[in-house]
């Protein structure tokens, strides 16, 4: 398959590297000094928890020309950058487009490209980019699928990821999956902003972490009451004591180890515009559906000097 990864941040670079190492025909769209670095020295990715640095000589292009056709394009941009890519995608001949990352307006985005086969995905990798390399943790797991009611893309997904090391979770209702993901990550982002990016300040603050969970539950409740599914299904019983205990253990681990910086605060502190837009749009969803979310609003107020 001929694949383009449109965007060369942490997620895009990990995706391109993994597909490339599986023998896929992959091209990476990158620009500026970072593109030149990859051309000269290869795409270098350092695994946070090992001494290993992979080097991948992936072809790089600076733009997507209208007459160049790919079997699939993965658009790996920040939520705030997606609109700027729509005209380019619309003009290109490629039919299969996968938007990877945070998104609470999946249905509207798909409607903006009616001639395309639109999928959405979320990959479990995180980290940061340095001038000459990416430093990250990559769990090689991706959740991917289309909107509920759209034609199944299971066969296409199998073809894309066949032979790779990815654990692929096919999700035929990505709109609800991404709504739920936003309802989980935004309260965690509030915690990052409260601590100026140093989550270790909260490692013993069980009361605050409990409020983070309360805000997540408010978000899930609003999503469920609006007629959407809670996804992944493991979170469906989100009002149970078991769910609270599981979340508390997770957040304590994040705050006590380097996982918090790598998986949460690195991105939150470097993508304030994206987190602000995500917060704005999911609150609009809450308001349109008459939801109450007082704990969410209180945590937001405490993080207010960062959010725009």
Each model region followed by its residue ranges:
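Rossmann-fold dinucleotide-binding core
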Residues: 105-183, 187
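NAD(P)+-binding Rossmann beta1-loop-alpha1 motif at the extreme N-terminus of oxidoreductases
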Residues: 1-51
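Rossmann-like NAD(P)(H) cofactor-binding subdomain of soluble oxidoreductases
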Residues: 52-135
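Helix-loop-beta segment of a Rossmann-like dinucleotide-binding subdomain
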Residues: 133-143, 193-203, 258-269
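N-terminal glycine-rich dinucleotide-binding loop that anchors FAD/FMN and/or NAD(P) in oxidoreductases
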Residues: 43-60, 185
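Active-site-proximal catalytic alpha-helix in oxidoreductases
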Residues: 175-203, 207-220
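NAD(P)-dependent Rossmann-like dehydrogenase/reductase catalytic/cofactor-binding core
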Residues: 217-220, 224-308
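Hydrophobic anchor at the start of a short beta-strand
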Residues: 3, 25-26, 97, 118, ...
């Amino acid at each position: 398959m001929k694949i383009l990864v449109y965007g060369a941040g942490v997620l895009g670079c990990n995706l391109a590297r993994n597909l490339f190492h599986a023998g896929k025909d992959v091209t990476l769209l990158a620009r500026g000094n970072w593109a030149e670095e990859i051309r000269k020295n290869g795409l270098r990715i350092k695994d946070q928890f090992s001494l290993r640095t992979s080097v991948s000589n992936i072809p790089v292009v600076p733009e997507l020309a209208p007459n160049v056709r790919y079997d699939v394009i993965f658009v790996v941009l920040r939520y705030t950058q997606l609109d700027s890519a729509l005209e380019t995608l619309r003009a290109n001949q490629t039919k299969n487009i996968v938007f990877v990352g945070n998104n609470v307006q999946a249905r509207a985005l798909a409607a903006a490209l009616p001639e395309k086969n639109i999928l959405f995905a979320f990959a479990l990798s995180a980290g940061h980019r340095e001038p000459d390399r990416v430093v990250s943790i990559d769990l090689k797991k991706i959740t991917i699928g289309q909107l509920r009611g759209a034609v199944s893309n299971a066969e296409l997904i199998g073809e894309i990821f066949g032979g790779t090391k990815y654990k692929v979770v096919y999700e035929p209702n990505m709109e609800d999956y991404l709504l739920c993901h936003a309802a989980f990550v935004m309260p965690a982002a509030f915690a990052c902003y409260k601590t100026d990016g140093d989550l270790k300040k909260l490692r013993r603050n069980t009361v605050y972490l409990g409020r983070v969970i309360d805000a997540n539950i408010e978000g899930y409740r609003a999503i469920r009451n609006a007629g959407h599914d809670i996804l992944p299904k493991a979170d469906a019983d989100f009002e149970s004591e078991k769910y609270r205990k599981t979340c508390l253990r997770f957040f304590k681990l994040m705050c006590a180890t380097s996982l918090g910086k790598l998986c949460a605060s690195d991105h939150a502190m470097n993508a304030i515009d994206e987190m602000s837009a995500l917060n704005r749009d999911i609150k609009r969803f809450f308001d349109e559906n008459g939801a109450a979310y007082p704990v969410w609003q209180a945590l937001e107020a405490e993080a207010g000097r960062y959010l725009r």
